[in-house]
Structures are given as C-alpha cells and as structure tokens.
C-alpha cells in the first residue's frame, strides 16, 4: 500500500523532460514543473528555432519567462522523498529499481550495474552498452569464481604473514627479556660502582622493547585487519555465487573494484643483527678502569697556579681558576685613537706552581661548559721566573709537552711529535671520546715515565696515556683555556 502511494508521489515530482526526480524545480503558469536545467535547455531550443512563443513541453500552453516561479513546496517533497528508506516488508522488491520502481532486467556494461528500462533511457546511461542479465551472468560468474580462487590463495598468504609477525613479536619479546636478564645479572656483580650504568642500560632496553613491540603490535593489528578484509570479500563472493542471478550481479562493480584494488601489505620488521647488544665484558673493563682511577687518586696533590705576566689571562685569587679574555688593542690612525676588537691568536698557557721531579702525582681539572682547552704537563720552564711560556710553545713531547685538548666543542685531540717532513709542527691525532668529560684527571708517574688522562665524567675511563716520556727536567701541571672565556678550574682533593 505504502509503496503504491510512494510511486504515485514520485510520478508527481518527476521531471517530464529528463524523467528524473525534480532538481531545483520551477513551475510554469499552467502548473507543470520542470528541473531548472531542463526548462532552461528548452528555452535555448526555442530560441534556436526562432519560435516567437515559448510553450510548456507537456501541454503546449504558452508562457512568458518572467512568469516562471521556483516551487519550494515540490522541492521539499523531492527532498523528503530522497530520504525515504522503506523497510523490507514495505519497500520495493530487490528486483525492482529503487529510483523508478520498474523491474530490473538489464545490465549496463560501462557502469557494471543492474538497471531498469527507464534507467537505460535516462541521461546517466544514455549511449551505454546494455544487455539482458541472462546474457552476462555466465561471464561474471566465471570472473567472480576466478576472483574467489585468487582470494583464497591470498587468504593463505595473509594468514602466513599474520603468523610470521606473531612469531616475530614473540621472538623479540624473548630476546629482549633474555638481554634484560643478562643486564640485571651483570650489574648485580658491579652494584656498588655501576648503578648509573645499570639504570641507563635498562632504560635503553625498555625503550627498545616499547618501540619495537609497539611497532610490531601495530603491524599485527594491520595484518589481522587485512586478513579479516580478505575473509569478508570471500564471504561476499561465496554469498553471491550461491545466490540468485540478481544477487550475483547486484553491486558487482563495487566488489570487483575492491578485489582489483586489493594488495596484501607485508608487515614492518626489524633486523636483530643491526641492534646494539649489551655485553658484560665492557662492564668488567669499566670496573678495571674504575679500580685504576681509585688507585691513582691516592696520589692526589693540591695543585695551584703560578703567577704570570700574560695580560689577556685572568687567574682567580685562590689560584685554582684560569680564564682568557679577548684583547682590545688600541692604535692611532689619522690622528685619532681607535680600538680593535679583533681576536688575535694570543697564547694563554699557564703552569702549576708545583714541580714534579719524582714519584706519582694526580690532579683533576674542571672543564665543564668549555668549547676549547689544552691541559697536561710541561717540562723545562720555571713558573716563578714570570716566564711567558706561550712565546715558544710547540705542543710536542720532544719539546716537553704531554697534552691533550678540545676545540670547537666536540673535537678531542692528542698532540704528538711531528713527522720527519714537518718536525716543527705537532701531529694532532683525534681521540675517540664517547662521553664528553666535564672533569679530566691527570696522573704522572715520574719513574714509569707515563702521563695518563682520565674521563671522570664517564667513571674514570682512560682517555689517553703517554708512555716512555723523557722526564729529564722537572715537569709542571699545564692549563691553557685558549680563546674560550669559560674558566678552567683545578679541583681540590676534597671535591
């Protein structure tokens, strides 16, 4: 009953020209309504044939263009009609056109849709190739059967990928748990001195576990969705193939496009051989370094700085801190006094007041926040003579310098003897320093002829060691703040 009324209403609001529901309906004085685009096209046609009067395409009653009025009432009916969704009991049958109510007997090859005879004559399908459903059903049955077999194969591949990612996830979990266990066991042996390293290593592994398992879980979720999607397509195809001819062809374009556009995506995985693996021997080496540092600290001496006559070097009152300042050079030109702010390459090396002629001696220098410095020991000069060390500086062991340095904030170097081709210039070799030191320890063993440098910031790791040093003269602690104005500080034994 309701469907019959609905069809009658649809007839009343269907454009007589395009046979579709009215779009932006306009009403003529005679009462007939048309789509705005359709009646406008009718006007142009009348002008083309030079007709003196414009007439209604239905009843042929003449009208003037200015008498055409928008029909809001009809527009509202059309809008409501488009929103109507009938229940299965009251709605149209599945084999009837939802738009025209006519029986679906034809198949449009271009749109791959089942249509009625009115659809075939509409603007949407005009010029398309249409066939009776019986003529194309077998062809599409073969296509869908082939697609079903292909999807079943893809289902197997998808399930294998899903299983692989789950196995990969479990493998990563076991591997990382194993590494965590090793870390805990190794750090337990070194608990007193390696608490920081233990915490740092565990944090790294926790972050690695979180990142990798999170990524693998996302991949697993994608694989599950992918598998489910394939299953849904298979279920849809099986339903179509087992149903009626109408069910086979109804919406077949959509299902074919989904199948054609579907490609299986492989999950993101990680290579175990590319990750950083924790090794306990490194901790044992760290323990050896720490024990060596503990041993040399027994020889800590209270070093202070000697007075100097270098104008651009500032020594603190406690004689533990030294810093450099940029020189300001005054000069006359054209009868006027000018100030130059140019940074000349002045030397800024300072000696410690304590001379070393025997035994073992150790001290530490705070170099935090500095971008450049040089430190170590220097031989052959008497600091109490107010001698400007820098006038004859040549950082080579053969000239009495056993030093290391930093430049540009990241480049650590050791100054060695120059080659035979450049004997008067030191060979500056780069040092591999993983953790930048805020404090450097210096140890001199006069009898063993060695000078060692320790990274106190990194648990006393050895930075560099000079061996077979020629200590034919007294040696002194040496500090050079270079052009960086941040001070260098000699640490007291109690610090």
From Swiss-Prot:
Q: Let me see what the UniProt entry remarks about domains.
A: The B box-type zinc finger domain and the coiled-coil domain contribute to the higher and low order multimerization respectively which is essential for restriction activity. The coiled coil domain is important for higher order multimerization by promoting the initial dimerization. The B30.2/SPRY domain acts as a capsid recognition domain. Polymorphisms in this domain explain the observed species-specific differences among orthologs.
A molecular function (GO) held by this record is: pattern recognition receptor activity
Q: How is it modified after translation?
A: Degraded in a proteasome-independent fashion in the absence of viral infection but in a proteasome-dependent fashion following exposure to restriction sensitive virus. Autoubiquitinated in a RING finger- and UBE2D2-dependent manner. Monoubiquitinated by TRIM21. Deubiquitinated by Yersinia YopJ. Ubiquitination may not lead to proteasomal degradation.
Its encoding gene is what? Answer: TRIM5
Zinc finger (B box-type) positions are: 92-133
**Which EC class is this protein assigned?**
transferase
Name the Gene3D superfamilies for this protein.
Answer: 2.60.120.920, Classic Zinc Finger (3.30.160.60), Zinc/RING finger domain, C3HC4 (zinc finger) (3.30.40.10)
- Annotated SUPFAM superfamilies: B-box zinc-binding domain, Concanavalin A-like lectins/glucanases, RING/U-box
Q: Which residues carry this modification: Phosphoserine?
A: 87
- Please describe the quaternary structure of this protein: Can form homodimers and homotrimers. In addition to lower-order dimerization, also exhibits a higher-order multimerization and both low- and high-order multimerizations are essential for its restriction activity. Interacts with BTBD1 and BTBD2. Interacts with PSMC4, PSMC5, PSMD7 and HSPA8/HSC70. Interacts (via B30.2/SPRY domain) with HSPA1A/B. Interacts with PSMC2, MAP3K7/TAK1, TAB2 and TAB3. Interacts with SQSTM1. Interacts with TRIM6 and TRIM34. Interacts with ULK1 (phosphorylated form), GABARAP, GABARAPL1, GABARAPL2, MAP1LC3A, MAP1LC3C and BECN1.
Entry's CDD domains? Bbox2_TRIM5-like, RING-HC_TRIM5-like_C-IV, SPRY_PRY_TRIM5
State the pathway, as annotated in the record: Protein modification; protein ubiquitination
The record's GO CC annotations read: nucleus; P-body
> Which positions does the record annotate as the modified residue N-acetylalanine?
2
> For binding Zn(2+), which residues are annotated in this chain's numbering?
97, 100, 119, 125
What reaction gets catalysed by this protein?
S-ubiquitinyl-[E2 ubiquitin-conjugating enzyme]-L-cysteine + [acceptor protein]-L-lysine = [E2 ubiquitin-conjugating enzyme]-L-cysteine + N(6)-ubiquitinyl-[acceptor protein]-L-lysine
Q: Where are the zinc fingers (RING-type)?
A: 15-60
Please state what the protein is called: Tripartite motif-containing protein 5
Q: What is its main location?
A: cytoplasm
What start-end ranges are recorded for coiled-coil regions in this protein? 137-177
């Amino acid at each position: 009953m309701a469907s019959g009324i609905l069809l009658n209403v649809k007839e009343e609001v269907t454009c007589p020209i395009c046979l579709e529901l009215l779009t932006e309906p306009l009403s003529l004085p005679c009462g007939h309504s048309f789509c705005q685009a359709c009646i406008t096209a009718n006007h142009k046609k009348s002008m083309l044939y030079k007709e003196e009067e414009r007439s209604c395409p239905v009843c042929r009653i003449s009208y003037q263009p200015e008498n055409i009025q928008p029909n809001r009432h009809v527009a509202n009916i059309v809008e409501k009609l488009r929103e109507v969704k009938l229940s299965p009991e009251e709605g149209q049958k599945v084999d009837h056109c939802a738009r025209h109510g006519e029986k679906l007997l034809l198949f449009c090859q271009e749109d791959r849709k089942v249509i009625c005879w009115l659809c075939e004559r509409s603007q949407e399908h005009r010029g398309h190739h249409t066939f009776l459903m019986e003529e194309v059903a077998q062809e599409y049955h073969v296509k869908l059967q082939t697609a079903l077999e292909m999807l079943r194969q893809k289902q197997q591949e998808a399930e294998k990928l899903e299983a692989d990612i789950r196995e990969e996830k479990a493998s990563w979990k076991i591997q990382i748990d194993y590494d965590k266990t090793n870390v805990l066991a190794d750090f337990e042996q070194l608990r007193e001195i390696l608490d920081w390293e233990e915490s740092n290593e565990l944090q790294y592994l926790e972050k690695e576990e979180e990142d990798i398992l999170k990524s693998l879980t996302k991949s697993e979720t994608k694989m599950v969705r992918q598998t489910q999607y394939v299953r849904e397509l298979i279920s849809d195809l099986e339903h179509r193939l087992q149903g009626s001819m109408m069910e086979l062809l109804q919406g077949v374009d959509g299902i074919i496009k989904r199948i054609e556009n579907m490609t299986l995506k492989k999950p993101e995985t990680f290579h175990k051989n590319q990750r950083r693996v924790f090794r306990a021997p490194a901790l044992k080496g760290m323990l050896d370094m720490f024990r060596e540092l503990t041993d040399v600290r027994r020889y800590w001496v209270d070093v202070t700085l000697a007075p100097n006559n270098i104008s651009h070097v500032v020594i603190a009152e406690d004689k533990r801190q030294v810093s450099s300042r940029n020189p300001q050079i005054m000069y006359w030109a054209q009868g006027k006094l000018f100030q130059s702010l140019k940074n000349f390459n002045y030397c800024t090396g300072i000696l410690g007041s304590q001379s070393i002629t025997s035994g073992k001696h150790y001290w530490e220098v705070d170099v935090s926040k500095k971008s450049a410095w040089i430190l170590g020991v220097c031989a052959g000069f008497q600091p109490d003579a107010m001698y400007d060390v820098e006038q004859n500086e040549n950082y080579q062991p053969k000239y009495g310098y056993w030093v290391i340095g930093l430049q540009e904030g990241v480049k650590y170097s050791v100054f060695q003897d120059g080659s035979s081709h450049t004997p008067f210039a030191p060979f500056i070799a780069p040092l591999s320093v993983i953790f930048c030191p805020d404090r450097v320890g210096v140890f001199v063993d006069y009898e063993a002829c060695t000078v060692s440098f320790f990274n106190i910031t990194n648990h006393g790791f050895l930075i560099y060691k000079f061996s077979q040093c020629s200590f034919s003269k007294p040696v002194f602690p040496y500090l050079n703040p270079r052009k960086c104005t941040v001070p260098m500080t000699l640490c007291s034994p109690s610090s």
